[in-house]
Amino acid sequence: MLDACLNPELAAEITCQPVRRHGVDAAVFFSDIMIPLALAGVEVTITAGVGPVFEQPVNSVTEVNRLVERRILDASAVEKAVALAVAELGEDTPVIGFAGAPFTLAAYLVEGRGSRDHLGARAFMHAEPAAWDRLLSWCADLSGEFLRIQVAAGARAVQLFDSWVGTLCLADYTTRVAPYSRRALESVSVPRIHFGTGTVHLLEAMAECGSEAIGIDHRIPLDEAARRLPGKVLQGNIDPARLAAGWENLAAHTRDVVERGRSAPAHVVNLGHGVPPETDPAVLTDLVTLVHEL
């Protein structure tokens, strides 16, 4: 996976394929939230059925102090991949860059791999607040630099992914995570989308981090999200499970999502999370066609 992300021609081709095959209106740059860590020399592998695995977890003050000395040394593969995709797609189809949010990166680093509740990261946050600040600051700067690299190469919008932030309570998010997400988002001036999963209790706090749009997962109706986030563009929130529920069910659900999305100033129609790998590609094509007709 990481090798594919760092092969410019292959990454550009994978970026462009959904536009050609499904007719989507924008292309999300093909990469992985682990790429900036790998470019900074952090030893990480993607293990089938597990996800990212770190040879040396960053779960002590000593390890944090060692980590924060690292910097991205060579991003030429990413720069070339974005530039190739931008050139291929032209002016009518923007490329969207992305990066992992500081908390999600830190959770992986502290625990050495993904976990259900991220107890290790949450414990470290409270047990070593000064080291947590250094770690989150470093992650914010790394993600910010990764976003800047993509924008400089031609990406016209970016998205900050906080996959694991839903495990936090509001107080911890507001005081110990949100400032660093804001720091990462402030690194670029193109339109920014801020997305997390399981974040119904965090939406207002996320909206204060400086993005123009908020990504919404399937757990809350879009009209309710729009009421809670006045003036914010929304992205989402088709339930990925509906892709395997039959066309009539998916179509009815999609119409409902689009109708509720009209409550927001604008709505970027998308899934509430990633495409399940077993999804029939033809269903995605039909879904895009339906949305364009609504």
Please describe what each predicted stretch is:
Residues 1-48, 178, 183, 281-294:
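N-terminal basic, low-complexity leaders that serve as flexible interaction/assembly modules and, when applicable
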Residues 2, 6, 64-75, 240-244:
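The substrate-binding groove and active-site-proximal loops of carbohydrate-active enzymes
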Residues 8, 22, 71, 92-96:
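Short secondary-structure junctions and interdomain/linker hinges
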Residues 33-36, 51-52, 60-62, 102-104:
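A short acidic, glycine/proline-enriched capping/turn motif at secondary-structure boundaries
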Residues 38-42, 57, 106-110:
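Short, conserved acidic/polar surface loops in the N-terminal third of protein domains
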Residues 43-52, 111-116:
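A glycine- and small-aliphatic-rich helix-loop capping segment at beta-alpha/alpha-beta transitions
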Residues 48-88:
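A gly/proline- and charged-residue-enriched helix-loop-helix capping module
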Residues 74-294:
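Active-site loop segments of alpha/beta catalytic cores
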